[in-house]
Structures are given as structure tokens and as C-alpha cells.
Regions:
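Single conserved hydrophobic/aromatic residue that forms the stacking wall/gate
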Residues: 1-8, 12-13
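Short beta-strand-centered segment that lines the nucleotide-binding/catalytic pocket of NTP-utilizing
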Residues: 7-10, 245, 278-283
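Conserved nucleotide-sensing/catalytic segment adjacent to the nucleotide-binding pocket
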Residues: 14-36, 41-43, 265
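Hydrophobic "anchor" residues on beta-strands that sit immediately upstream
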Residues: 27, 41, 61, 249-250
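Electropositive, glycine-dotted interaction segments
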Residues: 34-188
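Hydrophobic positions in the central parallel beta-sheet of the AAA+
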Residues: 64, 250-251, 278
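Conserved NTPase motor "head" modules and their coupling/switch loops across ABC/AAA+ ATPases, GTPases
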Residues: 116-249, 258-262, 266-269, 275, ...
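Walker B catalytic acidic pair
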Residues: 253-255
Length: 308
């Protein structure tokens, strides 16, 4: 159960929001604010948190926006972002490894730029390489398991969504295999120095989607790509349920207007037991008579009013 409260004009001025989360009968207060200098702060039951990992498990959320419908056809960075966001929500160990990997990759890239002026520092690359391999290998391993888990769920969901016409499979395409990681870094060293960036590692991974054996990222229609994206988000919900034994909150951000009536119906019929927050224009067109609505808020010219 979730309720959101804008606490008086003071909170609005400070760009703050207070949220109450209830899980298994235990209520937790979360305060979030954005300061004038754009820095963010979060406190749980009055205690300021120091790192994002402290939020893990507090409230599992699946966010679905129009941009997600393009995840299949867009660049690999968006597909990596989807996988990373999901795994960071479910696995604190993955979050730890990803954060450290990114920091080390940035440090290595800085060194690669410095080598232009200080070529004598070239031998220090191996220090960063060993750490990159250590943390990067754990990322690759976890991504492989994640894709296997997702494939077990997405198969049946996509078959139903496509009217039994398609079988969908996600294929993980690591930039480098773990056993070759260190050697690949050494082999790419001259190239990395020239380009001043690390060109080998899981930060260059990709994921492909195959419907009936056809790579729909390259050869699929927009309809196929959108159906696969919807299957992916619905599978994300089921995977969170399976791993955490808890139902996530679903946030639908103006995504219904981007779906045809069949996909709208499939989505709304599939979220009947999930607490959902929907933002959309034309509420009557998309939602009325399809889902049970508990609370409706209308935003007009920056003013929020409750309609029920």
C-alpha cells in the first residue's frame, strides 16, 4: 500500500514529498527533497540515508513509459540500463559491483587521457585492468543468470500477447567472455590509448530479442518490437514477484496512449492484482470501465485536485 502526501506549502516550496509505505503491516515514512542547488536528499523514518543501496527492498517498483516501447529498436545503452536498473533493485551485490566497476572504468579512462602527456604511466594500466576484470566478471555472471530467469517467464507471456503466433527469446551478448576478459584488455591497450577510453568490458554489452528465431531489433516490425517491449515489462513484474515474494508497485507514465486497444486490454487485464499509479490524458478513453480506480487526481495549470 502506498500513499503520497504533499505536506503543506512549505514542502512545495522546498520541492519535497513525503511518502508512506506499508508492507506486511509495518509503515515506513520516506522523505525526499530537492534543494535549490539541485542536490537530492532522502530520509527513512527521519534518518538520512547515505547511499542508494539503503533503499533496496524498501519498495519494489516497475516503471513503464512510452520510451520503454522503443527499448528493442534503440541503442544498446538503453537495454543495458533496463537490465542494470532491474538488477540493482533486486540485488545489492550487483549494485555494489556495478558502482565499483563504473568508478574503476572512469579512473582507467582518466589514465588513458593522461598517458598522452605521461607515457611513463603506461605500466600502471594493469592495476586498473585487474580490478576491472574482477568486478566486471561478476556483472557478466549476474546478467547471464538474469536473462535466463527472464526467459523462463517471458516465453508464456509473449505467446499469449501475440495470440500464440510468436515465441520470444532474449539473448545476452556480452562484449567479452569472462575467461578472455584480461587478455582482451591487453590486446586493446594501444587502441584504448589512442581513443582515450576503455573499449572492452560489460559496459559495451548488448541484448537481442528473437521472435520465432528472427532478430526483431533488426528485422522486426514496429508492432513486433512494441509487443516484445510490453512482454518485457510484464515479465519484469513477474520476476520481481518470484524473487522477492512481493508484488511491486506499477507506474504507468502516459504509456496507454502509445498502445493499440488490444495491447491496452492485455496490459490492464494483467495488472488487476497490482497496485498501479497511472498518469494519462483522456482518463475516460484509456481507463474507465477497465480497472477499479481508488483515487483520481487531476492536474490543471499546475494545480492538483482530487476528484474522488
Amino acid at each position: 500500500e502506498i500513499a503520497q502526501c504533499l505536506v503543506g506549502s512549505e514542502m512545495c516550496i522546498r520541492d519535497s514529498i513525503r511518502t508512506y509505505l506499508e508492507k506486511e503491516g509495518v509503515e515506513t515514512r520516506v522523505d525526499m527533497h530537492l534543494r535549490k542547488n539541485k542536490s537530492k536528499g532522502i530520509a527513512i523514518d527521519g534518518t538520512k540515508i547515505k547511499k542508494a543501496a539503503d533503499l533496496l527492498g524498501l519498495c519494489n517498483v516497475v516503471f513503464f513509459s512510452p520510451e520503454d516501447l522503443s527499448i528493442i529498436k534503440n541503442g544498446p545503452a538503453e537495454r543495458r540500463r533496463f537490465v542494470d536498473m532491474e538488477l540493482c533493485q533486486l540485488d545489492s551485490f550487483y549494485l555494489y559491483n556495478l558502482n565499483h566497476y563504473n568508478k574503476i572504468a572512469n579512473q582507467r579512462n582518466k589514465l588513458l587521457k593522461d598517458l598522452y602527456f605521461r607515457p611513463d604511466l603506461k605500466d600502471t594500466l594493469m592495476i586498473w585492468d585487474s580490478q576491472l576484470v574482477s568486478f566486471g566478471s561478476k556483472i557478466i555472471e549476474r546478467r547471464k543468470v538474469f536473462v535466463e530467469q527472464l526467459n523462463e517467464i517471458i516465453y508464456n507471456i509473449h505467446k499469449r500477447l501475440s495470440g500464440d503466433k510468436e515465441e520470444l527469446k532474449i539473448v545476452y551478448e556480452p562484449d567479452v567472455e569472462i575467461e578472455n576478459f584480461e587478455a582482451a584488455l591487453r590486446a586493446a591497450q594501444d587502441k584504448d590509448i589512442k581513443l582515450k577510453q576503455t573499449t572492452v568490458g560489460p559496459h559495451r554489452d548488448d541484448f537481442s530479442f528473437y521472435a520465432n528465431g528472427i532478430d526483431i531489433r533488426r528485422f522486426g516490425s514496429q508492432g513486433q518490437q512494441r509487443t516484445a517491449a510490453l512482454s518485457l515489462k510484464l515479465s519484469e513484474i513477474e520476476l520481481i514477484k518470484k524473487i522477492t515474494k512481493d508484488t511491486p508497485i506499477l507506474l504507468l507514465d502516459d504509456v496507454l496512449s502509445e498502445l493499440d486497444s488490444n495491447r491496452q486490454n492485455f496490459l490492464l487485464n494483467g495488472i488487476g492484482d497490482i497496485q498501479t499509479i497511472i498518469t494519462c490524458t483522456g482518463l475516460e478513453e484509456f481507463v474507465n470501465n477497465r480497472v477499479e480506480m481508488n483515487k483520481i487526481f487531476k492536474v490543471s495549470n499546475g494545480v492538483v485536485t482530487s476528484e474522488n
